[in-house]
């Protein structure tokens, strides 16, 4: 997948990690920064993004919705990948996660942990509809200790008509 992406952006607060990313992807825009802050403030990099790598050490969904709502320049077809660390908290405290409120009302609190990847897919699709985008492909898997991390990829088209 990365070989198809000629330009992109990566954010991370960890200096060592972001230095490694910059060496691996020299043609990308790479920031040691709080990505949510940058997205909310419509970071201007001078290029249209086509690949975004989100690694928030918690919920990634706030980042996705803020990016979709933003005026940040992007290609008509772009990719978001995320390393989402929220799943562990969902075992006992899903109801505390504000961004999951709509999903909890639809699917129930007890469904959130065991079906989290499907919930993320559904929520990103909802965000896309709300912001005039189309989710064209979604995939992911659980990993890490006790499968409490979630890695996913979302391919999104800009300006698609909501169904």
Please describe what each predicted stretch is:
Residues 1-163:
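SAM-dependent transferase fold signal centered on methyltransferase-like domains
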């Amino acid at each position: 997948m990365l070989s198809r992406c000629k330009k992109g952006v990566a954010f991370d607060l960890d200096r060592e990690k972001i230095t490694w990313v910059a060496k691996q992807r020299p043609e990308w825009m790479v920031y040691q920064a709080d990505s949510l802050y940058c997205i909310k403030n419509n970071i201007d990099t001078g290029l249209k993004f086509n690949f975004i790598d989100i690694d928030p050490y918690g919920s990634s969904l706030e980042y996705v919705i803020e990016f979709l709502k933003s005026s940040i320049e992007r290609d008509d077809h772009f990719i978001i990948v995320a390393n989402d660390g929220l799943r562990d908290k969902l075992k006992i405290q899903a109801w505390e996660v504000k961004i999951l409120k709509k999903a909890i009302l639809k699917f129930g609190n007890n469904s959130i942990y065991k079906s989290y990847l499907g919930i993320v897919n559904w929520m990103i699709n909802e965000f896309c509809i709300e912001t005039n985008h189309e989710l064209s492909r979604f995939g992911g898997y659980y990993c890490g200790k006790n499968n409490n991390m979630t890695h996913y990829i979302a391919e999104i088209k800009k300006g698609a008509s909501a169904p």
